[in-house]
UniProtKB/Swiss-Prot annotation:
Keyword Nucleotidyltransferase part of the UniProt annotation: yes
GO biological process: DNA-templated transcription
Cofactor note: Binds 1 Mg(2+) ion per subunit. Binds 1 Zn(2+) ion per subunit.
Gene Ontology molecular function terms on file: DNA binding; DNA-directed RNA polymerase activity; magnesium ion binding; zinc ion binding
Disulfide bonds: none
SMART domains: RPOLA_N
The EC number(s) this enzyme carries: 2.7.7.6
Protein residues bound to Zn(2+): C69, C71, C87, C90
Name of the protein in its database record: DNA-directed RNA polymerase subunit beta'
Subunit structure: In plastids the minimal PEP RNA polymerase catalytic core is composed of four subunits: alpha, beta, beta', and beta''. When a (nuclear-encoded) sigma factor is associated with the core the holoenzyme is formed, which can initiate transcription.
Family: Belongs to the RNA polymerase beta' chain family. RpoC1 subfamily.
Parts of the chain that traverse the membrane: none
Length: 680
């Protein structure tokens, strides 16, 4: 549908029988109206042509071949010179065959049928509006009992039957005579209603505004009563109040959307376009049909049987008619939602038929598979892995994916730079993956962002833009800081990559969708680019050194025991003197040369003008040297003093991991300060 703002949208809801017939009906030049499917047949077994008025009828749903009618006549589509748009012999319209994807038909039901979604699904909307138990309504719909509708204040059939034992003795003689009168069946049908027709009558008699008013008054009365002191009664009152709120909201929705409650009971059953329930011929001449066709055939068979009982056989017992109405109701239920009433219907191979609900719901349903999650051009999908060396706004794209996504741009680049004379030569170079191809591909990718999406896309940060770079392997590399926005981790998650084609899409990606432009949560405003997953583990490993300071494992070798009753593994344990480094570059160089480990403690020279925060005043040890200098050793730092007790230098106890982390933080702060200075 198109709303008043010209936005395309899809709305699922109830429609009137008039709207259903308007969707399907077509008027032929001879005045005949077609659109109703009356026969349960599909194709003729000899001619392989659709049966007239059947489930694939060309008069109702349009021609199988564009511009060719059932007779074989051909006319140019859209030719204004042609007077008639319909074939005079077969009544098929000369239009494009794609009309069979959206042209609907309908089945005129011989009896009203409740829509099983609004009756059996929880909460039951019909039971909510009528304020009646669901079991009672189900018994009424499936003809287990009847609904009384007395037409006068005088004693009627139902009143007489209900008060038979309480009236005077003379009624015992008059009632049997009354039951055997000639017009009793007509009188009974006038007073007794059963099946979905009874539900439709009750829904049609509803005044939605009165429902809202009465429900509101009752809700206020229950609220004024207060707690009764009985837990069971208080829960019962609470459930009733919740029910009244739901009933008022439902009634307001019907009023706001101009939907009549009786539309929940079907008189016309829409028939899907044929292309949405196809019959396909496979190898060997066998036909493979959609389950929807078989369920439609079952509805038509039972509906036609009911029509015959009502029209041709005047003396049909009422119980037989009620039984056939129940069969029609069950057939429509199976078509709409197979298995909702218990055991699902199965075919001859014990396979459950896929109903309309099964076709549209779930991950493989019509909406999620072919509309929301359909495959599009210029897109790919792969597993994500961590890219620790990437910038926040970059992503690593595998060569195999990149060369396919940017193939069109790559061909244009090869031709423009005269590396290929035409498209064929360019494609040949791409297939052979010549070195020049990768150079041109890198140039193309530098100015073209890509969009990464992880399903389900629950908020706008589920799709973000990145600057792609080529990486080896077959996995997409992602910066770990952007994982929280995607709700992704690196345990096998997959992400889709899309290439924005138009200039508007590329500009929007660069200005609004780049990952470094989306650092805050759009819901609560908190930072969303925070360390998670692998980054937390990496930070822990980087900074996990010996946290107990110089005292650890130095004076108490028994600390190396795993248990008090176990022996020391290394009885020759000796304290290893930590190395001294003048600057962080020497320490990192020693780590790269594998002279020290990432978490090995070391002494790093500290600047005298920088303050060291001490946790204790007295030194743990004091080492004196022959020249008179001495070293005062504290928990996490060391001070070298002269004979005159002047501070010569300070060393702090740290690890290569801490040094690497602090250098990264320092570079980030300096870069931020430079950016701010450029901005001012």
């Amino acid at each position: 549908m198109i709303d008043r703002y010209k936005h395309q949208q899809l709305r699922i809801g109830l429609v009137s029988p008039q709207q259903i017939s308007a969707w399907a009906n077509k008027t032929l030049p001879n005045g005949e109206i077609v659109g109703e499917v009356t026969k349960p047949y599909t194709f003729h077994y000899k001619t392989n042509k659709p049966e007239k008025d059947g489930l694939f009828c060309e008069r109702i749903f349009g021609p199988i071949k564009s511009g060719i009618c059932a007779c074989g006549n051909y006319r140019v589509i859209g030719d204004k010179k042609e007077d008639s748009k319909f074939c005079e012999q077969c009544g098929v319209e000369f239009v494009d065959s794609r009309i069979r994807r959206y042209q609907m038909g309908y089945i005129k039901l011989a009896c009203p049928v409740t829509h099983v979604w609004y009756l059996k699904r929880l909460p039951s909307y019909i039971a909510n509006l009528l304020d009646k138990p669901l079991k009672e309504l189900e018994g009424l719909v499936y003809c287990d009992f009847s609904f009384a509708r007395p037409i006068a204040k005088k004693p009627t059939f139902l009143r007489l039957r209900g008060s038979f034992e309480y009236e005077i003795q003379s009624w015992k003689y008059s009632i049997p005579l009354f039951f055997t009168t000639q017009g009793f069946d007509t009188f009974r049908n006038r007073e007794i209603s059963t099946g979905a027709g009874a539900i439709r009558e009750q829904l049609a008699d509803l005044d939605l505004r009165l429902i809202i008013d009465y429900s509101l008054v009752e809700w206020k009365e229950l609220g004024e009563e207060g707690p009764a002191g009985n837990e069971w009664e208080d829960r019962k009152v609470g459930r009733r109040k919740d029910f009244l709120v739901r009933r008022m909201e439902l009634a307001k929705h019907f009023i706001r959307t101009n939907i009549e409650p009786e539309w929940m009971v079907l008189c016309l059953l829409p028939v899907l376009p044929p292309e949405l329930r196809p019959i396909i011929q496979i190898d060997g001449g066998k036909l493979m049909s959609s389950d929807i066709n078989e369920l439609y055939r079952r509805v038509i068979y039972r509906n036609n049987t009911l029509i015959d009982l009502l029209t041709t056989s005047r003396s049909t017992p009422g119980e037989l008619v009620m039984c056939q109405e129940k069969l029609v109701q069950e057939a429509v239920d199976t078509l709409l939602d197979n298995g909702i009433r218990g055991q699902p219907m199965r075919d001859g191979h014990n396979k459950v038929y896929k109903s309309f609900s099964d076709v549209i719901e779930g991950k493989e349903g019509r909406f999620r598979e072919t509309l929301l999650g359909k495959r599009v051009d210029y897109s790919g999908r792969s597993v994500i892995v961590v890219g620790p060396s990437l910038s926040l706004h970059r992503c690593g794209l595998p060569r195999e994916i990149a060369i396919e996504l940017f193939q069109t741009f790559l061909i244009r680049g090869l031709i423009r730079q005269h590396f290929a004379s035409n498209i064929g030569v360019a494609k040949s170079k791409i297939r052979e993956k010549e070195p020049i191809v990768w150079e041109i591909l890198q140039e193309v990718m530098q100015g073209h962002p890509v969009l990464l999406n992880r399903a389900p896309t629950l908020h706008r940060l589920g799709i973000q833009a990145f600057q792609p770079i080529l990486v080896e392997g077959r996995a997409i590399c992602l910066h770990p800081l952007v994982c929280k926005g995607f709700n992704a981790d690196f345990d096998g998650d997959q992400m889709a990559v899309h290439v924005p084609l138009s200039l508007e899409a590329q500009a929007e990606a660069r200005l609004l969708m780049f990952s470094h432009m989306n650092l805050l949560s759009s819901a609560i405003g908190d930072p969303i680019s925070v360390p998670t997953q692998d980054m937390l583990i990496g930070l822990y490993v980087l900074t996990s050194g010996n946290r107990r300071g110089i005292c650890a494992n130095r004076y108490n070798p028994s600390n190396r025991k795993n248990h008090k009753n176990e022996k020391i593994y290394n009885n020759n344990y000796k304290y290893t003197k930590e190395p001294f480094f003048c600057n962080s570059y020497d320490a990192i160089g020693a780590y790269r040369q594998k002279r020290i480990n990432l978490d090995s403690p070391l002494w790093l020279r500290w600047r005298l003008d920088q303050r060291v925060i001490a946790s204790r005043e007295a030194p743990i040890e004091v080492h004196y040297e022959s020249l008179g200098t001495h070293h005062e050793i504290y928990g996490y730092y060391l001070i070298v003093k002269s004979i005159k007790k002047e501070i010569l230098c300070i060393y702090i106890r740290t690890t290569v991991g801490h040094i690497s982390l602090y250098r990264e933080i320092e570079e980030a702060i300096q870069g931020f300060c430079r950016a701010c200075s450029y901005g001012t």
